[in-house]
Swiss-Prot record:
Taxonomic placement: Bacteria, Pseudomonadati, Pseudomonadota, Alphaproteobacteria, Hyphomicrobiales
Name of this chain's protein: Ribosome maturation factor RimM
Keywords of the record: Chaperone, Cytoplasm, Ribosome biogenesis, rRNA processing
Gene Ontology molecular function, alphabetical: ribosome binding
Gene it is expressed from: rimM
GO BP, sorted A to Z: ribosomal small subunit biogenesis; rRNA processing
InterPro entries reported in the protein's UniProt record: PRC_barrel-like_sf, PRC_RimM, RimM, RimM_N, RimM_N_sf, Transl_B-barrel_sf
Family: Belongs to the RimM family.
Classification via PANTHER family: RIBOSOME MATURATION FACTOR RIMM
Subcellular location: Cytoplasm
Length: 189
């Protein structure tokens, strides 16, 4: 299969692991080892990567790719994003509160009054729960928690996510703390 026509990011390659060409991989699959079930993976330029071996080591997945046989070759892959074509995803239905990250990118974030706070430009998980990055032309990107309180509704047909500005930290809280300084920690729904 050539470069995916409708790419879905499945993983990103991290640092080299050991001296035999293995790499650490951050996966975006429910089961981290499921990355090996999709066959060939592709980078943004369309280069194919075949997984020969994958295993979990502590909190990361260690992968050995075909043709990557030493540490230097492994180090050269650091930061490479890996994709599959959307058609390779399982046909099973997603739960109501499950989404493909790629489907959220580009949605406009609006409050109940229709005020725009930018568009979803990325989704991050730094260990404390998912965060949505909102970008607005001429402004610095903002991170908001991806919780039911902060993002109570997602409407793909309208191309929007509804945000609750107080819960998302977009406006001052009841104690007049500036946005993003309320001291509250985001929680996963």
């Amino acid at each position: 299969m050539p470069r995916p026509e409708n790419p879905i990011q499945l993983a990103v390659i991290g640092a080299a692991h050991g001296t035999r060409g293995e790499v650490r991989v951050k996966t975006f699959t429910g089961d981290p080892l499921a990355i090996a079930d999709y066959g060939l993976l592709y980078d943004e330029q369309g280069k194919a990567y075949e997984i020969l071996e994958a295993r979990v080591a502590k909190t990361v997945v260690i992968v050995r790719f075909k043709g990557v046989n030493d540490r230097n070759a492994a180090e050269a892959l650091n930061g490479t994003e890996l994709f599959i074509d959307r058609s390779q995803l399982p046909d099973e239905e997603l739960d109501e509160d499950e989404f493909f990250q790629t489907d959220l990118i580009g949605l406009e974030a609006v409050d109940g009054d229709g005020k725009s706070y930018g568009v979803v430009s990325a989704i991050f998980d730094f260990g404390g729960g998912d965060l949505i990055e909102l970008s607005e032309k001429g402004k610095r990107p903002m991170l908001i928690p991806f919780t039911e309180a902060a993002v109570p509704e997602i409407d793909f047909d309208k191309g929007i996510i509804k945000v609750e500005p107080h819960a998302a930290g977009l406006i001052a809280d009841e104690h007049d703390n500036p946005p993003h300084e309320s001291g509250k920690k985001p929680k996963k729904p």
